[in-house]
Amino acid sequence: EASCGGGIPIIRALNSSLTADEIDEITGILNGTTNYMLYKMSTENCDFDTVLKEAQAKGYAEADPTADVGGADACRKIAILSSLAYGKFLKYEDIYTEGITKITPADMEYAKELGMTIKLLATSRRIGDSFYAMVAPFLVGQSSPLYSVNDVFNAVFVHGNMLGDAMFYGSGAGKLPTASAVVGDIVDAAKHLHVNIVTN
């Protein structure tokens, strides 16, 4: 869980609760650091460098934030989720990835004028026997449930042929949500000691 959603138990949902569904779309805000930064840029009219320093001071961003702000972190997460959901291995190197380094306060103001906001989304969709994934900043309208996902929170939207639409929501940045997910993974591994787990 810690590798994908911070405090969101999305991997267990895909591996257990949704095994009867044929998943055809996963879209989400998978990086709490960049979501925090974009939220601050939107609400406080701050520039990129200012909010990055603030995120680092609060422990949300690493000393080297390249993987977060460049989109690589979200890219790796959508690769993992897509591989689990579709049953086919997806190399993260094959995913088009664009981060938030070029987003300016002017972009945020333009989005507001349109009644929208800018979010860094990771998305993948099944198309026939194959699937497509990408990570990039998107304009998100108020009708989308992702519009209201602010601050350090993450959200993953999943669409299945029987489930329909579902959204998983939780804290996605900071040491405590990640630590909680790591402990959960360790406990899960301990419960399955000496058990062979067959994967395709």
Question: Where are the predicted features?
Answer:
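Hydrophobic residues in alpha-helical segments
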Residues: 18, 41-42, 112, 190-193
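Catalytic, metal-anchored helix/loop core of enzyme active sites in primary metabolism
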Residues: 25-27, 35-38, 54, 60-65, ...
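Substrate-binding/catalytic subdomain of NAD(P)-dependent oxidoreductase enzymes
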Residues: 51-148, 153-155
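Generic recognition of stable, solvent-exposed alpha-helical segments in well-folded globular domains
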Residues: 9, 73, 106, 177, ...
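Small/polar loops that bind or transfer phosphate-bearing groups
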Residues: 1-2, 170
